[in-house]
Amino acid sequence: MTYKIYFLFFIFLGCAQVTSLNLQKHQFGQIPTKIVWIQVAGFEEEHLATLKFDSSTKDEALSFEKFLCLGKAWEYNLYNIRPTAESSFLGQLTGDRNIKNSCEDYKAKPIWKLISKNGYKVGAFENGASNDESLESAKACGQDGSNFLDDLVIWKMNKAPAKSSQFFHVNEKSNFEKKTTYYDRSCLTGECYSNLSQNIKSVFSQFSRKSDKYLFIVRDFKYKSDLASKNYSKYKASLKELEKTVEYFLSLSSESKNMLVLLTSAKSKVLEFPKSGNQWKEFEQSGKYLIDRKSKLISTVMASGARAENFCGIYNQSQILPRIFSGSKQQGLELAIINPFD
């Protein structure tokens, strides 16, 4: 009888322990009902040195450093090694490695088609996406493309194609409708006067209002363009905007146990940072040592909040999607495998 008491004591003691991930308190097996997915073309975590070694912030932890989990995803599919950023992002959103850069790609089901039937609101915010990079490129693929974009609201920081387009603005309140694309009113001349973090805060607060289930996707292609320009000021400004965006969403996730903040990259670029203090000063002033090489074969994944534990490790890009929901859920003293898509 004594042995049974000790056995039960240790079981309940284990259940009462506070679990942690990356030395931070974390509840495992939590199903995300509020999902923010940030896709950044060109990003690689070493780029954060640009902000980390800034004289004004070097002793402070960056928002990026507060993610609970850092993972890596292989950048290839069935047809290409180092595919384009838009192809990689499509593979991530659909969980499909069979990406051909053709209309056939839009026959696959993206994440929003899997969860919208369960009451999730879905929206995608695009920054600096070209016609080929934008999700709207699916519209050129007939019914498959139209079906692919069903239930989706799209916001774009781009110049509107026509005066009759729908618009949003950082200082305006709107009721956003499904199957509609909204353009940033501040981009009418081609150059956007509102910044990324302010726009996202404004749009997201309206989009998520009175909603317990949502998927909000941020797709940033401007970062890749600014990096390729080798203009240090533009590149650093884009990175700072991402830092502010991450800070905003991580702050929200700390207040909601059902919220997942996921950041993934594609076409990740390696930068050759300077080796010494004097060179770093030149780098900051002129971007003299801002040299980029070929994109990497492996890209960055960062996660915090519900199901963050699933994103540690190395895996294929097509495996990012199922990791959002698949896994184990604690039920009493046993673990049961769940899948909300069944």
Where are these regions (language model features)?
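Active-site nucleophile/metal-coordination loop of metallo-enzymes that catalyze phosphate/sulfate
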Residues: 21-34, 44-145, 303, 312-314
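His/Asp/Glu-rich, glycine-adjacent segments
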Residues: 84-226
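Loop/turn elements at helix/coil->beta-strand transitions in domains of secreted/extracellular proteins
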Residues: 31-36, 117-123, 209-216, 254-261, ...
